[in-house]
């Protein structure tokens, strides 16, 4: 473990003698910053300065004062999982009495309810269930597309893809091709957490490695899909590890252009094996969002994470580099299992975006704007968030 930590530090050796102002000026002027620069930004306590730089960079990508959002639902189709992450309160071991696999008809009903209120995206994720074979996933996707041809299936994280490949003794490329052919449209970036082995070995020893997570995303692009990049902080990781995470995401984007968006949030340790860890603050979250926007000069869209941070902090993040409010998320079970529950429907989303001084616009998963809302205009049919 000591050797792993030292290896991460070696990657940012050389440091930087630049001041915070000089680093930010370079970034705002379109120059790339280094991992050493990122570490120096993490060491800074000048949150306002970081936020202003990130906001300036965001406006270069998105000059209009529009904040987008998508109407969608998180469907957790199974909680059986043999990865046993120490920070997860949602999973149950295989064959546990409290585990489940949702019936197809239940999933279909959830999707119908989503479309009935103007929803366009289904984020379907679950545990790494060793009892589910590839045909479970392909048959489910085909059934969904037969009934709901217009719904966008943004589903199955890299860890789930690797589990299917393991169960079937197939390559992840072959698995992804079969899923894409059956109706999978894009891949969410769940399970990235921190892309360094020292942290992953400490908190999720059985989970896919950083390289495997990146390979899944690159392969998804190869077979005709795209994905999102994510980052979770609060595991006790070093600033150097955070910088290395960002570097690996930036490198993958340079190589393949596989990411449409970046989303970060804080570890929610309640009810988990990491409950003794000190929970990070909203300021830590906003700093990470800002530094990520400053560093990741090749990803256009940054989502706010109101699900973990709450609507008010989510609103504030729109001035720290985020141009998107994420999904309204009719249903969410994983974060709420860790005793963190925030509920935001479509009309509250519109209100929060307007309070931030922005114009709300509904988008699809490809970040194409479907509808821009005028002042005081609301959705015709809304929902109550379910858990």
Q: Model-flagged regions — what are they?
A:
Residues 7-9, 13-48, 115, 247, ...:
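Auxiliary Fe-S-binding modules of radical SAM enzymes
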Residues 30, 54, 85, 124, ...:
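Conserved, mostly hydrophobic/aromatic
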Residues 51-93, 99-125, 187:
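N-terminal pre-triad scaffold of radical SAM enzymes
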Residues 67-73, 122, 153-157, 187-189, ...:
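Hydrophobic faces of well-ordered beta-strands that scaffold small-molecule active sites
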Residues 74-76, 127-129, 156-163, 191-193, ...:
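Active-site beta-loop-alpha junctions enriched in small/polar residues
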Residues 119-217, 222-227, 235, 301:
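Conserved SAM/AdoMet-binding glycine-rich loop
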Residues 171-175, 236-248, 309-319:
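Catalytic cores of alpha/beta
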